[in-house]
Amino acid sequence: MPGTTDKAPGDDTGLLLPVPDEDGAPFWDHAARGELRVQSCSDCDELRFPPRPCCPHCQSFASHWRRMSGRGRIWSYVLPHPPLLPAYAALPGYNAIVVELAEAPRIRLVGNLVAAPDAPLNSVDPARLRIGAPVKAVFTVLPGGVTVPRWILERP
């Protein structure tokens, strides 16, 4: 899956942005269209994430991208104290969550819980974070044109 960088063209925030690699690029292409998709084996139909060339279940190299509902639940979370990078110092109380997808419980994505798609990373009171809380994906276009999935509480 993609690594991260501290700067992208047109970005002056210093926040970490995805750097798509060959296997993960379709994930980000679909995100740019507002779709949450996960790589699926074309032979055994097993989902896999992070994306990779070979199916870990049947070793097939044939794959496609299956659309997900965008719903899930918080499987885990962390509140970094203090913020680990300088650009995040202005965002005290931001979170990083791990979401277990509703239709694929073995697939877990890392992201941020926000109050609205374009809200800052620290827009949700940390006291509202709960393991098992239902969430749904929203998509945010960041400076530099990169679109990332973030998460909002399904029942705020």
Roles of regions detected by a PLM:
Residues 9, 106, 110-156:
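Well-ordered alpha/beta subsegment
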Residues 40-43, 54-60:
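Short, cysteine/histidine-rich loop/knuckle motifs that typically chelate Zn2+
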Residues 49, 62-64:
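Short functional micro-motifs and their immediate structural scaffolds
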